[in-house]
Amino acid sequence: MVLGGCPVSYLLLCGQAALLLGNLLLLHCVSRSHSFNATAELDLTPSGAAHLEGPAASSWEYSDPNSPVILCSYLPDEFVDCDAPVDHVGNATASQELGYGCLKFGGQAYSDVQHTAVQCRALEGIECASPRTFLRENKPCIKYTGHYFITTLLYSFFLGCFGVDRFCLGHTGTAVGKLLTLGGLGIWWFVDLILLITGGLMPSDGSNWCTVY
């Protein structure tokens, strides 16, 4: 069949070629657009936060309270690493000069335990607004040195006459006296049992009982 001097099959072939060329051009444009968007996303930083280059590449300068990036000091405990409380060993002057730290450790009731600030830092790979190192307040002045209440109570009950419980807790002087008197003929042994149960006999280094989970 001939239409206007041109075979219909020839016209259809030209149309298919034009469609194929159009599809190729469209695919090329889409590919270039996708590549540009991917590059732009790498350069973007959250609104209100300027990205820092160098070692602190996962930090931003905090400038906008509406930014999705929070200050590092607002991170939950599981995303930060904190130092142990500073022990000033009763030196009040050193505590005042530094501005934080513990004068004493330990305590049974909450009101007996001192609280202080400690140095914390955001974990590697956590993105937050700088500074990445900060002070976190209200940390209890307690430490653990491997003393377990149940173990010490068993020592006191079965071997208390020989002062094993006090040796274990670091009270060496009174432990020797308890050993030489065989637990004060049983009186000292009984008194130490009561003191352990009521919290009157604790480790000599001011540490708390380790918790058994």
Curated annotation (Swiss-Prot):
Q: Which organism is it from?
A: Mus musculus (Mouse)
Cite the ranges annotated as topological domain Cytoplasmic.
165-181
Signal peptide positions on this chain: 1-22
> Which key words tag this protein in UniProt?
Glycoprotein, Membrane, Signal, Transmembrane, Transmembrane helix
Is Membrane one of the keywords?
Answer: yes
State the membrane topology. Multi-pass membrane protein
Question: Which residues does the entry place in the Extracellular compartment?
Answer: 23-143, 203-213
- Record-level GO cellular component terms: membrane
Transmembrane segment boundaries: 144-164, 182-202
* A Pfam family hit: TM2
Report the record's disulfide bonds. none
What family is this protein classified in?
A: Belongs to the TM2 family.
Top-rank taxon, per record? Eukaryota
**InterPro entries per UniProt:** TM2, TM2D1-3-like
- Domain TM2 positions: 146-194
Localization recorded for this chain is: Membrane
Protein name per the record = TM2 domain-containing protein 2
Is Metal-binding tagged as a keyword? no
Glycosylated residue positions: 37, 91
